[in-house]
Amino acid sequence: MRRRRAPKRPVMPDPVYNSEVVTKFINKVMWDGKKTLAERIVYGAIEKLGEKGEEKGIDLFFKAIENVKPLLEVRSRRVGGATYQVPMEVRPERQQTLSIRWIVDAARNRNERTMVERLANELFDAANERGAAFKKREDTHRMAEANKAFAHYRW
């Protein structure tokens, strides 16, 4: 284990929307260090979102991330030989990270032809409270609700 917590590294806002969240999203989409390709995919998806919905693409993008953010999650805790799933609140930074991760993973598992289409459709679904990423959030909340009895094991 490390002696102290690793310092948070600053994230540069992206050049198009001047947003750190978009940069984090691009970094999550990126594979093998191909950032230019990841940028093309994310910006293309946001543009497509704007054509799909009646709102601006970037507004739908933020709405999608907001809708997928989990408020509660379960974490394993060992107590006297038994492992309990303890529901806990999620810190805001982790909420954002999980939201981005779930959206990107859900987009990768979709069946559309290009990643731009997959990402745009997943973001659109998430903005409208449906789709695989939103379902993942609901499942997480359901798990936390089911294990509410173990909430007193929180640490």
Curated annotation (Swiss-Prot):
Subunit structure: Part of the 30S ribosomal subunit. Contacts proteins S9 and S11.
A Gene Ontology term for the protein's cellular component: small ribosomal subunit
Family: Belongs to the universal ribosomal protein uS7 family.
Function comment: One of the primary rRNA binding proteins, it binds directly to 16S rRNA where it nucleates assembly of the head domain of the 30S subunit. Is located at the subunit interface close to the decoding center, probably blocks exit of the E-site tRNA.
CDD domains: uS7_Bacteria
Protein known as: Small ribosomal subunit protein uS7
One term of GO molecular function: rRNA binding
Alphabetized NCBIfam families for the sequence: rpsG_bact
Signal peptide: none
